[in-house]
């Protein structure tokens, strides 16, 4: 007895076991954009069902998001000569990107005449940083300043979704919409830190 595996389940399992690249091959194969040279599991070569010639393409790219910061600060003064300040920062990051590619062709020999390929990416992150600075009044007229901006230590995770549809030479539409959210492992990102000095007289 052979169990039926839906395209949604297949897309999900391919992503879990083999990764993003294999999911792209799956979408191309199931939407008839690509065909394997041979129908066996060991095959690694494919050919396109679109004949070379002229293509009309439209590409839509949309982004939105925010990068926010919440700051807690404290300051102390020693006599009238030394001033110290500290900022503790909590960073929030959210970024959405959506892309859509439309492609049409009337090329002789093309089995596929229309492609609609959509991708979304959602990025979520939070981070921490601090600033520490001081001003030293050497004399009444002369001041030295030094500030350290720490790196921002981010924890970031990303999610993607995909959709593809094609129309073949007989005007039959094939839609591959897995409705699967690919959630990738959280990774860390660190921006550079810096020192800033100043003199005033």
Please describe what each predicted stretch is.
Residues 1-201:
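Outer-membrane beta-barrel porins/channels
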């Amino acid at each position: 007895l052979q169990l039926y595996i839906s395209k949604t389940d297949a897309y999900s399992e391919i992503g879990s076991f083999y990764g993003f690249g294999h999911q792209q091959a799956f979408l191309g194969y199931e939407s008839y954009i690509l065909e394997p040279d041979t129908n066996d599991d060991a095959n690694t070569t494919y050919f396109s069902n679109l004949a070379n010639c002229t293509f009309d393409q439209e590409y839509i790219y949309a982004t939105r998001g925010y990068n926010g910061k919440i700051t807690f600060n404290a300051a102390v003064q020693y006599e009238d000569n030394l001033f110290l300040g500290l900022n503790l920062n909590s960073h929030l990051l959210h970024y959405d990107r959506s892309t859509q590619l439309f492609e049409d062709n009337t090329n002789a020999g093309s089995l596929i005449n229309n492609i609609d390929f959509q991708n979304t990416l959602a990025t979520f992150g939070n981070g921490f940083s601090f600033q520490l600075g001081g001003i030293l009044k050497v004399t009444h007229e002369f001041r030295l300043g030094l500030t350290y901006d720490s790196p921002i230590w981010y924890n970031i995770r990303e999610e993607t979704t995909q959709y593809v549809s094609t129309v073949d030479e007989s005007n039959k539409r094939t839609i591959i919409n897995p409705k699967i959210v690919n959630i990738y492992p959280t990774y860390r990102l660190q921006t550079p830190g810096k020192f800033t000095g100043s003199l005033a007289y």
